[in-house]
Structures are given as structure tokens and as C-alpha cells.
Amino acid sequence: MPLHNLTRFPRLEFIGAPTPLEYLPRFSDYLGREIFIKRDDVTPMAMGGNKLRKLEFLAADALREGADTLITAGAIQSNHVRQTAAVAAKLGLHCVALLENPIGTTAENYLTNGNRLLLDLFNTQIEMCDALTDPNAQLEELATRVEAQGFRPYVIPVGGSNALGALGYVESALEIAQQCEGAVNISSVVVASGSAGTHAGLAVGLEHLMPESELIGVTVSRSVADQLPKVVNLQQAIAKELELTASAEILLWDDYFAPGYGVPNDEGMEAVKLLARLEGILLDPVYTGKAMAGLIGGISQKRFKDEGPILFIHTGGAPALFAYHPHV
């Protein structure tokens, strides 16, 4: 078993049972292709989402180090920050979040609703900054201040996307392979590619478990030129942690993130509405809507390697729908 080293890393069991892997019959009929969906939007805590897989490893490491405070950063409507705050609440830890307003909006829904509303419910200490220009350095500076106040902070990077956190999606690849075995031969997998941990973890896991399946990352914030080194560097860091090789080519499409991170676009919003109306499943305007737009466009433009079944990784994000009203 090529991924046996995963068991060496401490991990908290937040998720428990595997998340569903479902066939989408009406959406498949609409697109003329078999489409499956991995429902990481329904992980158990705080309205679900993919970051919980990373936090199983990161929070375990925080407890191992004796931390009493989790510190992380993201946009005002960050799904990662929301899930980190929920984990902190569950574990009886303090949570400090460094937030930016990446789209420069004054819209009340964005500033106070959706994920931001949930941060208050989880009693998160909020620190605002003009921009996360160097988030690692900014988080370390914040940790120094928090430590000076007598706390024992543990820094979680943006998106939980370091080699340790990304192990959550190596684990997810194992789960996907087990669910597909004897049921469906997935030809292509599509995932939103942002802070890169989910994409890189899947890349390492699927290379060893489902090597015939191509993995497409649809970028949500950067061009291929900017995103590729982030994913590749993390892919190699994960492989080093697991003491295995990672040589799979990283495939990225950057046609769907414009005009920028956190700003809805027409293709993404069309995808959100389409899946809601055909399958009753909620995507979001920031990540999964744009990734699904990539899947839809990839089929119409014949960009996939063949016409076999496609698996979409639903990473969550539905709370942002309320923050982006009236765009939705």
C-alpha cells in the first residue's frame, strides 16, 4: 500500500464516515456525460467544507504542541477561517483570525453575513488588515503579539495549505479510490485550485491510487504561471513527508477565475444556478461555481482526455451565497 506512511501522522477524527460520492443523473443528462460528485460540502462541522480534512491533521499537531490558540488568515468570507474557528470551539481553544477584504467592497452582506456571521457565533477574535500581502510573515507577527499576551499560539497557514494539512486530501484520494473500486472508472477529476493544498494532496494520492485518472485544477485566483509552482512545490513537500515519489503532471485551467479572487463571474454564477436547479446541490460563487464552470466548459470544448466519467470535488462554500446576495 503506497500511502501506508499516512498513519504515522497524528489525526483528529472530525469527519468519521466517508463523505458521499454520488451520481448526478439530471446534470449528466444535461451535459451528455456521466458526472459524479464527491460531497465534501457535507462534512459534519460548521456547514461543511473541505478544510476540515486538513484541520484533522493540523489541529492534532496543535494539541501535540500544547497550543491553546489557533491563528489563521483569509478573506472576510473565508471558508477556511470559518472551519478553523469551529474546530477551535470544539476543542476549547481560542481562535484569532487575520482577515482582509480582497474585493474592496462596502456591501453590508459581504462584511457581516455568511462566513463572517459564523465567525462571531464561534467567538473568534478578529484582526483586520489592509491586505494579506505576505500572509506567512503577517501570521508570525500576529502570533508573536498573541504569545506576548500569555497565550500559546499555533499558526495555521492560509487555507490550511502546507504539507501537513494537505495530507487530508491524500487521505481523501484513498477514500475516493475505495468508493470507485468496482463501481465506476473515473476518467477525469475536477477540483478548484486556490491555496493549493487540496489540489496537491489529491495529486499525490490519485497518482498512486488512480493513475489512469487525470486531475484538473481550475484556478480561482491566479494564472497558470502563478499557480503552477504553488501546487508543484506542495506536491513535492507532501511526497517528501510520505517518503514516496510524486511525478504526476499538474494540470491547471485558468480560464474561469476572472475578474479575480472572490469576484463572481457570469460562468460561475450560471454553474451555481444550474446545479441548484437540476440536482438541488449548492455551489458557491468563489470556488466551486468557477470550478464547475470549468467542468462545463471543458466538456463543450472537448478539453478532457476522453469522454469517460468525470468526478467533481465539491469543496463546500455555500455560506458565501448569503454574503454575495444580490449577485446570486
Swiss-Prot record:
Name of the featured protein: D-cysteine desulfhydrase
Species of the source: Escherichia coli O8 (strain IAI1)
Keywords tagged on the record: Lyase, Pyridoxal phosphate
GO function terms (MF aspect): D-cysteine desulfhydrase activity
UniProt subunit comment: Homodimer.
Superkingdom as given in the UniProt entry: Bacteria
Family annotation (InterPro entries): ACCD_DCysDesulf (IPR027278), D-Cys_desShydrase (IPR005966), D_Cys_desulphydr_bac (IPR023702), TrpB-like_PALP (IPR001926), TrpB-like_PALP_sf (IPR036052)
Record HAMAP family: D_Cys_desulfhydr (MF_01045)
Family to which this protein belongs: Belongs to the ACC deaminase/D-cysteine desulfhydrase family.
EC identifiers of the protein: 4.4.1.15
Reactions catalysed according to its record: D-cysteine + H2O = hydrogen sulfide + pyruvate + NH4(+) + H(+)
Function text: Catalyzes the alpha,beta-elimination reaction of D-cysteine and of several D-cysteine derivatives. It could be a defense mechanism against D-cysteine.
Cofactor(s) this protein cannot do without: pyridoxal 5'-phosphate
Residues that bear N6-(pyridoxal phosphate)lysine: 51
GO biological process terms, semicolon-separated: D-amino acid metabolic process
